[in-house]
Amino acid sequence: IWEPACGMGHLSKRMIELGKKVHSTDLINRGYGTGGVDFLKATENPYGAVITNPPYKIALEFIEKALDISDEGTRIAMFLKLTFLEGKRRKPFFRDNPPRKIHVFSSRASVAKDGDFTAIPNNGNAIAYAWFVWEKGYKGETVVDWIN
């Protein structure tokens, strides 16, 4: 598994706990994984599945890059705000690259930048999130399910 926006390693560490072999990189060195690696400049994917929580402003670019450099059948999972489904700019992308599955969290999640939950305002920041899962080459209907 390649985790190309590993940050402080929260997602990578959990996957390793689950017995997965994970290659963790990030553009910025935050003390975990290999820093200074610009995923958007990658020309190949030697690690297999891509699983990450990409920077939201360039999430589409992350997905497009992962699909571009991965082999047919490779799975790509991105932790994204549910609102990622919205937008005229992304509509053609979803039409041409339908996710195989979208796993929606049934409860809103609090997500803290760099794992710093003390920075969350008292009124919270609970937002609807989902795991969007692509399989390179898949052209069928997207299945939506819920994570409790």
Model-identified regions with their sequence ranges:
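Class I S-adenosyl-L-methionine-dependent methyltransferase catalytic core
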Residues: 1-148
